[in-house]
Amino acid sequence: MRLLPEAALEVRPVRLQMVATAPSVAHIERPVYARWGYDYWQQRPDGSVLIGGGRDVLRDDEETDQQVSTAQARNYLMSLLNDLAVYEPITHAWAGIVGYSASGQPWVSQPREGVYGIGGYCGTGNVVGTLLGRSLVELFVDGDSQTLRDFGYLN
């Protein structure tokens, strides 16, 4: 990890990639997480479809901190779109870097005095990151955090 060297042994960067299509006549009823969350998609109100995934199929190529969309990922995602009967052109493609922990559990640590680190949410940072961030604030302000205790981060 670039921001906190102590996290490098616990959290590794992983690239997640997505594409968006032009509005589609296909109907996708609800957001979907398929293949244990490796693939995911949803349709926006305007009919466009957002789809991401393939990290496990692309394997080692995705264990990187390079935030670029690749042709391999776009091809994989286009094949998923075809399986969903979505044939509209791709209008946008992007990639983002997230942290994955070796244990599958978020990394929470105080590696040195006055420094705390949280990360390695394995793709759930939008929810778990907020929860753990608030829990650290609770620890700083109140001297304790029941949430951190419940997750086993405090004795």
Question: For the regions a protein language model found, what residue spans apply to each?
Answer:
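Short glycine-/acidic-enriched loop or helix-start segments at secondary-structure transitions
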Residues: 3-6, 30, 61, 127-128
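Central helical "cap/lid" subdomain
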Residues: 1-27
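C-terminal catalytic lobe of FAD-dependent flavoproteins
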Residues: 36, 79, 83-155
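Proline-rich low-complexity regions
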Residues: 1, 13, 30-31, 106, ...
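Short, glycine-/Ser/Thr-/acidic-enriched flexible segments
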Residues: 1, 24-26, 56-57, 113, ...
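Active-site lid/adjacent beta-loop-alpha segment flanking the redox-cofactor pocket in flavoenzymes
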Residues: 10, 27-103, 110-111
